[in-house]
Amino acid sequence: MYSWYFPKDSPSTGMGHRHDWEHAIVFIDNPDVPEPKILACSVSSHAGYKKYNPCPPWVIDGTSLKVRYKHGWPLNHDLDTTGDAGTFQDLIMWDQMTEDARRALNSVHFGSANTPFNDGNFKPKLEKAWPF
C-alpha cells in the first residue's frame, strides 16, 4: 500500500474539505522474490476503490505502478492509474517510522479522512480493495 496525505482537498472554490488520505494498493505474486510480478491493483477514491485485475500494461513501469492524483470536479480529488510518465517518490515503511510517528498516525483524527495504513485500518482497507 502506497499512501499520500493532502492537507486540503478543494478542486473548486468554496467546495472540498480539510485533510485527505489517498492510497494505491499493488497486489503481487510473491513478496519474497527480488522482482515480484504485479497481479492486480486498486486505487482509492471517495466512493471506494477502482480495481484493476489485471492492471492495464501501460500503467506498469517495470515493478512500479503509475498513479495520478486527479480532481473529481466539483467536490474531490482521487487517484487513478495512468500511462503517463512520472517521477518516483521516496518510500517510507511503517517499521522505519519512529514510535512517536506511528503513535500519531494511529491516534490523530483527520476528520472524515483516515490514515489507511495505520494499525486499525490497514487490514480492512486491503480487504475492501481486494480485486480477486
UniProtKB/Swiss-Prot annotation:
Domain of life: Eukaryota
InterPro entries: NPP1
Protein name: NLP effector protein 15
Annotated keywords: Secreted, Virulence
Induction trigger: Expression gradually increases to a maximum at 7 days after inoculation of pepper leaves.
Transmembrane segment boundaries: none
Family: Belongs to the Necrosis inducing protein (NPP1) family.
Organism of origin: Phytophthora capsici
Keyword presence, Secreted: yes
